[in-house]
Amino acid sequence: MDINIGYPMPLDDNILTEDVENASNTVSESDYGSHTMVIYQDLDILREFYSYYVKKRIEERNEVIQIVPFYETEDSVRKSLSEGHFSIDVEKWEKDKKSLIIVDSLEKYYGDETVESSYISSRKLVKDAKMMGKSGVSVLGDMGAFHYKHRIQELVDYELFLPSHYDIDMKGICLYHQKDFNRLSVGQKQKVIDHHEISLKI
């Protein structure tokens, strides 16, 4: 006899598994304001994802992109973006066009900024992008810094502080290594998933 005693649905039912290109297109085609979570299996997959996304948004959509890596250095991100099928002229977009910003996640999340000031700086980034004639901003931030600092509850609080939908021309893309996501409790996972408009696994 099948008795429903109110257990929640499995978490994976709320997460869409896609290949890298489809996942990138899903995020790219979402409206400004979207708050997305992307869980990635390894660095190679992540690099392919952000390389595809950055090329499309910078070259085709006239957007400013901020990448906030944790499991690789700023220079290794530049190297990944300048090589492979989806390569771009990193120096041109980073220095000349001011469309690419790469900031280490420990600096962004544990530097001088608080959670509140980090959000304020994102709003300022959108304002500056608009003044340059850009369509908007995408921020791809790796949440690994919180796990490195053993501040899991702080990570959940940070996610819940951010709006589920931004009221500015920005896409917030929270990147989670699968092993970091696995460290969250079931309740924490559910809160984080529910707070994002789109949850993807690549």
Please describe what each predicted stretch is:
Residues 1-202:
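Non-catalytic regulatory/interaction regions at protein termini and inter-domain linkers
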